[in-house]
């Protein structure tokens, strides 16, 4: 039963990622934390999101903007160890509350799309990248700061997606390296790989047929519910 639920979470998140270019971690991380615990849930979200981003980058690497992304990912790499250290030092119930709250905060940032002119330049890339690295290592949701940076830089979705995928590859690889691989059985790893493939196929088939706005709303709704449940589970265990 556990592997069936795991497959469903990863497949849905993978499908969403292929439909919108982002959203894997927002959908998967809260659910995986509830299923596997905060540490292994975040680590698996990082592993899977890195694989999905790498697959997407294969066809979109020409759209990466090095001038913007080098300071962004450099800042993220510097703060990933801080996020991993923080997560490793907290008791599990407290960690669940903190991670759930970070997920809810991430949803709020995406929904409001804060306009801050200072986030458009190199300084903004450093600030957003630093926040993203910490949030990715601690809670598996490093995408919202990237979204805010893209909004304030005036990027279109076509410009945003390859840069977000590049960031996703780097920050997730570093996040896993700063921690460890999630403790899964060989069978569960096969399930995850198969679910990622199924999610990609379904997402590719539905691309252009499903309204992006509706998918985005579903992503944020699922993430908010998952974050709230994670907070509730943590509070229950205190």
Residue ranges, per PLM feature:
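Small-residue-rich hydrophobic segments that form or flank transmembrane alpha-helices
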Residues: 3-70, 128-129, 133-136, 141-200
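Small-residue-mediated transmembrane helix hinge/kink sites in multi-pass secondary transporters
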Residues: 30, 83-88, 148, 204, ...
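A helix-boundary/kink motif common to multi-pass secondary transporters
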Residues: 37, 91, 156, 211-215
């Amino acid at each position: 039963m556990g592997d069936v639920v795991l497959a469903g979470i990863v497949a849905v998140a993978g499908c969403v990622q292929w439909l919108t270019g982002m959203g894997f971690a927002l959908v998967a991380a809260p659910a995986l934390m509830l299923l596997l615990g905060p540490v292994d849930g975040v680590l698996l979200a990082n592993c899977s999101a890195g694989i999905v981003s790498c697959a997407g980058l294969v066809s979109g690497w020409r759209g990466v903007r090095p001038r913007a992304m080098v300071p962004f990912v450099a800042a993220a790499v510097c703060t990933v160890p801080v996020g991993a250290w923080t997560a490793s030092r907290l008791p599990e119930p407290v960690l669940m509350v903190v991670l759930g709250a970070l997920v809810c905060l991430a949803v709020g940032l995406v929904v409001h799309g804060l306009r801050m002119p200072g986030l458009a330049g190199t300084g903004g890339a450093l600030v957003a990248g630093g926040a993203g690295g910490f949030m990715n290592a601690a809670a598996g949701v490093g995408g919202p700061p990237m979204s805010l940076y893209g909004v304030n830089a005036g990027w279109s979705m076509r410009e945003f997606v390859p840069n977000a995928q590049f960031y996703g590859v780097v920050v997730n690889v570093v996040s896993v390296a700063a921690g460890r691989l999630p403790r899964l059985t060989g069978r569960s790893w096969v399930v995850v790989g198969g679910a990622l493939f199924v999610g990609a196929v379904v997402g590719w088939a539905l691309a252009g047929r499903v309204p992006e706005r509706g998918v985005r709303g579903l992503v944020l709704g699922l993430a908010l519910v998952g974050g709230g449940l994670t907070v509730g589970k943590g509070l229950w265990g205190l």
